[in-house]
Amino acid sequence: MTTREFDYIICGAGSAGNVLATRLTEDPDVTVLLLEAGGPDYRFDFRTQMPAALAYPLQGRRYNWAYETDPEPHMNNRRMECGRGKGLGGSSLINGMCYIRGNALDYDNWSTHKGLEDWTYLDCLPYFRKAETRDVGPNDYHGGDGPVSVTTSKPGVNPLFEAMVEAGVQAGYPRTDDLNGYQQEGFGPMDRTVTPRGRRASTARGYLDQARARPNLEIVTHALADRILFSGKRATGVTFLHGSARVTAHARREVLVCSGAIASPQLLQRSGVGPGEWLRELDIPVVLDLPGVGRNLQDHLEMYIQFECKEPVSLYPALKWWNQPKIGLDWMINGTGLGASNHFEAGGFIRTRDDDLWPNIQYHFLPVAINYNGSNAIEMHGFQAHVGSMRSPSRGRVKLKSRDPNAHPSILFNYMAEALDWREFRDAIRATREIMHQPALDRFRGRELNPGADLKSDNELDAFVRARAETAFHPSCSCKMGYDDMAVVDNEGRVHGIDGLRVVDASIMPIITTGNLNAPTIMIAEKIADKIRKRKPLERSNARYYVANGAPARGGKPARAPAAV
């Protein structure tokens, strides 16, 4: 491949990069080179295409960068997983397919930061709608003709879903019929990025499928970006590794970095943009001393609160190899059955204290007892809640360890570094126990398997969190948007102090959102795509949305009080 020129070069064909590639090439006179370090999203590989197989990609390295943190000092010095997607679709190719946009107040809070006034919820909502096709049709909150297929939960799938939602309501928390609609707060059905044919709705399927045949888009897989090239303070191209060759491509307009919250700061640092002292440690020529690159790293940490199930209604039999051929065949031929769901079909968001302005705890309900990555399956019928805090004050960093593009960076999330983290996790465990002991779950609830009913004191609960809490795989905020001294990009994703260079992915979030990150990342890319194309922003929404405004976290008394559990 000889040196060539394109208008735009996109590094990373993930949740954001595929959106940009598709939208920019809608203009036939614009040429785009899309680089992806992984391979194609093979449509016959059940590991990425079958929703129920979501744990499989995390167990290997074909589709997973399989990063690992440095020893986390507040987590028994454990080196913890940090899985990131590798292949067309990026992390949308291996994620849990939960379609959660975040709380309206996440975006309203962003907009209070200097220069981010056009990132309110009502400014963002039109872009969420633009990206989405929801199976039950559009309304003020949801789209009907976007690239991403969103499937709603249907009643009667598993009695544990309805029982867990009802238990949350019986504990005094709100019920909501749409976690992405008027009111996120409460318990209810969970939307999923799954097609009507029961396939994963990655951005490769939703976006690239409509763009890959365009003559003005070139997609190169197995292309690992090495460095961004500069002329003075202007980005001019990218050098990447493709097989045994080192290839250079030039960008007439811009280089767009969409490599995610780990690899985007890594690429910037390797290219000479980042904290000067870090770059000098590796003898990297400093193009721009930008101290925020790799700082402000955030994630969601979660626990699995697990119970034995007294009735044989869980997914436990589906884990047995002798039942899996039938499940796979039903999915492959009909796009239905257990294989067609990620089985996160209910969940919720609550405030654990009345003075929380919006939900600080998320629930994913699952009708089986197993770790997210498929490990530690409990050998019995069981169910669980994935529970974690949403906006930890702890901050970490991504730091380059080597100039070798194949070397992983040093990653430290610094989980549980603040007193608020510990308070929220203790509150979450106690609130979950109270929910699980409500009458709606009486017929199903057996023994508490994890943490175990005998663990009650603060010290005992803290020890459980240190030993057993895991990542929810939501790294973000490491190239934050804003205008303070630690901001990396402006409100349009443009890197401060550099021309022709943007970062567009979850790394530019100033503060992590309340929930899963795939939907917000797609929205961010849709919004910035209009900025790049110099198009008028979509008209601001006037939809109503819920604000607690001092209302108690629980609107009613629990059906069964804590003293009785």
UniProtKB/Swiss-Prot annotation:
Known pathway: Amine and polyamine biosynthesis; betaine biosynthesis via choline pathway; betaine aldehyde from choline (cytochrome c reductase route): step 1/1
**Keywords, in A-Z order:** FAD, Flavoprotein, NAD, Oxidoreductase
Q: Record keywords: Transferase included?
A: no
If you read the UniProt record, what top EC class would you report for this enzyme, in one word? oxidoreductase
Organism of this sequence: Burkholderia thailandensis (strain ATCC 700388 / DSM 13276 / CCUG 48851 / CIP 106301 / E264)
Q: Active-site positions, per UniProt?
A: H474 (proton acceptor)
Its recorded name reads Oxygen-dependent choline dehydrogenase
Q: What is the gene called?
A: betA
**Per the entry, which co-factors are needed?**
FAD
Q: Which InterPro entries match?
A: BetA, FAD/NAD-bd_sf, GMC_OxRdtase, GMC_OxRdtase_N, GMC_OxRtase_C
* Lineage, top ranks: Bacteria, Pseudomonadati, Pseudomonadota, Betaproteobacteria, Burkholderiales
